[in-house]
Amino acid sequence: MMLRRLCEVVSMPLTRISRHERDMAGDILIELLKLGSAAMRQQTAQRLAALADSPKRVTLLLARDDVSVARPLLEESTALNDSDLIHITQTASSAHRRIIAARKNLGEAVVDMLAIHGDVQTLSVLLLNTTASISITTMDRLVRASRDHATLVAPLLRRQELTPAHAFAVFWWADEDGRRAILKRFAVDRAVLIASASDMFPIAAEDNFADAVVRKALQYIERRQRNRAAMARSPYGTLEAAIDAALAKPDLFVINEIAYICGIKPVTAAQIFGDAGGEAVAILCKAVGLKRDYVERLWRALRRPVSPDPASPFQRMAFAYDSLAVAKAQTVLRYWNWALSSDFNRNDLGKAEELDEDASVARQAAALVLGRPKRV
């Protein structure tokens, strides 16, 4: 009886009772709740969940209780502010965190803490919560988590906060459907970027591209399909001749020559040619203007089997080749080459989580992609 009366008092609006009187009633209620049954605490939590200004101490006590008690407060209570939710995230159970992760209109600070403390199930719930605001640093954390937990990839790719840097990294461990979604959304034309930087090429050429940062940026922006200087230096002369040589006798030298003629670094080529799925090879071939017969010759030169099975890597490669426009394939290839090679540091491999937040996007991408086993 006393518990019910006190619940009625603390549930009164502040137009009927002073805040101080209600808080004192709440202090007494806390002691009764600690000694009361779970059913009593559930009833109280259900009642307080509908109040916008329920007594804070009582609300926090019940919100940290067993999830059977805490659920309505964690799901609905507007009396719990971001600070309260962060505290609960840090101190309560995984079940509490999963309920909070599904809460409407979560702010970035709460989401950050959930990403730090949450298990894979919590992260999955969080990614599916379209009303949650996810910061760029937490997106970085979620992308890293998706490397080792494939169930996170699909909901991650649906987030509006996902950037090209994130997407083109996730590509390497996404499945076939995920890769198609990435290419459809992020493989865009660079027309505006190319036009805005068109006058920079002759200026940089006057200095023989001495500024390394500018040179690497222009390598991403440039429109050329192949590296003419590399073709002039190569003993093969053309990309097609290099592919023929690789088909006859593959070795590291000719594979590197193919990379240079394509305008990419060997580290990028190794990632592309070693990709089990096939789509990466298709992107390279389309970007450099390789005809269909030489696409298959390159595939064979890499000692990859040609199969009619629609689910085979060869058919996945062929589908991607036929689906992509040249300009869009160039965007992806150039971005990969810039991201994987412009700030590559072997000491970062396997240590993406340890990099400083101020590390360049390219350095983070290289550590993330090159520092893990390949899978599709």
What spans do the regions from the language model cover?
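Alpha-helical scaffold segments
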Residues: 1-376
